[in-house]
């Protein structure tokens, strides 16, 4: 990667635009959730990263539709919402200056014309104009795409089951789950969400707890000795209101090998927790 693969992302400077992207991305995830067969860990609600932004991946259409499937993409390079179908038709709408409600209505109309009926809560998509800073979006996309590459490398080196590198709109974060292969004592093995020992790794733009972008690593159940374990370079332990290892994004900006620092954080916490989970 280039030396500027990770641009500065101070949340205070683009939080309004981040919140706008959250509303736009919610449309993609809600459409996917409504039409995709249910999967464990809500993997029918997540989005994924492609070469230009966020994607729903292939969404199956109902049997009475005129197309077999479609895909929605939020292109963060061209600043556009794109809907493509298996019959070659599509729709492109600009994101800049777009009302979330209008995106919803246009998407609903396009799909309805092909026999795909959406039943979403229109109140989730405001009718008010929202800020959209193209330069800030492009910086975020540069960071997100490069983070996704590192997460992919981390996933490739994991033994055992792991989930897809996923994007979740409710917290606007990138996420990866890893499973130890052991069941959690006392939990019904049929409980798809909580029966398995697991770890979550992610990247978020910031929130009410940590008001700046950061990486996190958590474990379920949390090993008692993990909070006192030695953390990887640059990382700290977050104890309230949730517990997990944290690496501030800003640490990457001044590090000579930012990808190595991030990969070391992910691998280091995973190995430490995996030893203590046994």
Range-by-range predicted roles:
Residues 131-207, 214:
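Aromatic/basic-lined ligand-recognition segments
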Residues 2, 79-92, 119-135, 213, ...:
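Glycine-rich, often proline-containing surface loops adjacent to acidic residues and nearby aromatics
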Residues 97-157:
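Internal, hydrophobic cores of structured domains that mediate oligomerization or house catalytic pockets
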Residues 240-278:
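TerminUS-proximal long segments
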Residues 198-245:
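Low-complexity, glycine/alanine/valine/leucine- and proline-rich hydrophobic stretches
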Residues 2-69:
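N-terminal ordered "arm"
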Residues 63-73, 102, 205, 209, ...:
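Ser/Thr/Asn(+Pro)-rich, low-complexity disordered segments
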Residues 47-122:
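Long, hydrophobic/aromatic-enriched structural stretches that serve as scaffold segments
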């Amino acid at each position: 990667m280039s030396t500027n693969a990770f641009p500065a992302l101070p949340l205070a400077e683009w939080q309004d635009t981040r919140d706008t992207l959250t509303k736009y991305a919610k449309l993609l995830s809600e459409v996917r959730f409504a039409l995709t067969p249910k999967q464990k860990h809500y993997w029918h609600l997540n989005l994924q990263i492609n070469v230009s932004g966020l994607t729903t991946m292939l969404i199956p259409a109902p049997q009475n539709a005129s197309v077999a499937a479609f895909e929605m993409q939020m292109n963060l390079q061209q600043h556009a919402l794109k809907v493509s179908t298996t019959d070659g038709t599509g729709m492109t709408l600009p994101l800049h200056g777009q009302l979330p409600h209008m995106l919803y209505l246009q998407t609903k109309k396009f799909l309805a014309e092909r026999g795909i009926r959406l039943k979403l809560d229109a109140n989730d998509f405001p009718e008010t104009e929202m800020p959209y800073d193209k330069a800030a979006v492009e910086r975020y996309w540069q960071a997100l795409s490069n983070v996704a590459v590192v997460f992919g490398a981390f996933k490739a080196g994991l033994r055992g089951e792991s989930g897809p590198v996923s994007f979740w709109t409710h917290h606007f974060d990138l996420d990866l789950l890893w499973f130890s292969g052991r069941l959690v004592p006392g939990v019904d093995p049929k409980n798809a969400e909580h029966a398995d020992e697991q770890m979550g790794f992610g990247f978020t733009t910031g929130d009410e707890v940590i008001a700046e972008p950061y990486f996190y690593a958590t474990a379920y159940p949390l090993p008692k000795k993990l909070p006192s374990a030695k953390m990887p370079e640059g990382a700290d332990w977050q104890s309230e209101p949730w517990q997990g290892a944290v690496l501030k994004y800003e640490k990457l900006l001044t590090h000579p090998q930012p990808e190595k620092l991030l990969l070391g954080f992910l691998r280091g916490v995973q190995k430490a927790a995996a030893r203590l989970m046994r």
